[in-house]
Curated annotation (Swiss-Prot):
GO terms for biological process: cellular response to UV; mitotic cell cycle; negative regulation of inflammatory response; negative regulation of proteasomal ubiquitin-dependent protein catabolic process; negative regulation of stress-activated MAPK cascade; proteasome-mediated ubiquitin-dependent protein catabolic process; stress-activated MAPK cascade. The modification Phosphoserine is found at S32, S59. Residues 32-322 form the Protein kinase domain. The modification N-acetylmethionine is found at M1. Keywords: Acetylation, ATP-binding, Isopeptide bond, Kinase, Nucleotide-binding, Phosphoprotein, Serine/threonine-protein kinase, Transferase, Ubl conjugation. It catalyses: L-seryl-[protein] + ATP = O-phospho-L-seryl-[protein] + ADP + H(+); L-threonyl-[protein] + ATP = O-phospho-L-threonyl-[protein] + ADP + H(+); L-tyrosyl-[protein] + ATP = O-phospho-L-tyrosyl-[protein] + ADP + H(+). There is a cross-link at K169 (Glycyl lysine isopeptide (Lys-Gly) (interchain with G-Cter in SUMO2)). This is Lymphokine-activated killer T-cell-originated protein kinase.
Amino acid sequence: MEGISNFKTPSKLSEKKKSVLCSTPTINIPASPFMQKLGFGTGVNVYLMKRSPRGLSHSPWAVKKINPICNDHYRSVYQKRLMDEAKILKSLHHPNIVGYRAFTEANDGSLCLAMEYGGEKSLNDLIEERYKASQDPFPAAIILKVALNMARGLKYLHQEKKLLHGDIKSSNVVIKGDFETIKICDVGVSLPLDENMTVTDPEACYIGTEPWKPKEAVEENGVITDKADIFAFGLTLWEMMTLSIPHINLSNDDDDEDKTFDESDFDDEAYYAALGTRPPINMEELDESYQKVIELFSVCTNEDPKDRPSAAHIVEALETDV
């Protein structure tokens, strides 16, 4: 993947952009203020586009747009990433991966990626809601259901499409209703895998999100394989058990439940030392029903990638139980 310095603000529509847009029929996408904001990510916002022309009922879309406050330097980077995501997403067809709908320009001239509306909230939204309500961890059965659906999506990406997702975490999983559907989203930083499930392209760069990175992505010259997604998958299960972000301890005083987070309490050295390792679990908070979840989390977060299961093995192990 090219470095940021190699990108320049385009003065006119690039040939790559033209080729992607030409394959998309003309679609009237409203300006951002006229759509409900669903969420946001690095450099982008996601909106809900309701489609019911002339009284007809159409399924809504989720529309991803570049954040308007981005400066020109970063805008070109995010535009390329959005175009890459559109190209990849258009080739994917799986019930556990958010579907492609269109790639076009909105009425305000901004680039838009229209996707299947996978659900009202991300898994991260549900985790935060549960944490703020001081609720218990998600039931083991729900965690295993999420695990199976995510693993099916990853199996498809790894085996059939030879793609590493590259940024698995709770905020990149969308949920509809009461876990009626579970879909992986945000394939904008995906990387090609070779026949050995390894990222060998010298131009490819693993992006990920820091707390979910495996050891091989933290270390210099680490070899990235499909097992990088598996490590992050394991930490996503950990999120559902702990209602926390990996390696972020908001309070060092377990006896003071009302203690609020103070940046001065954050231990940078301990945080960076913990990256790529398996975070601890308070076993006293989890009953015996979580045994299979804990076992799956543990094997997926082994530091040596060779000791982690493939997505296909996870699917095989879970399909008989969920």
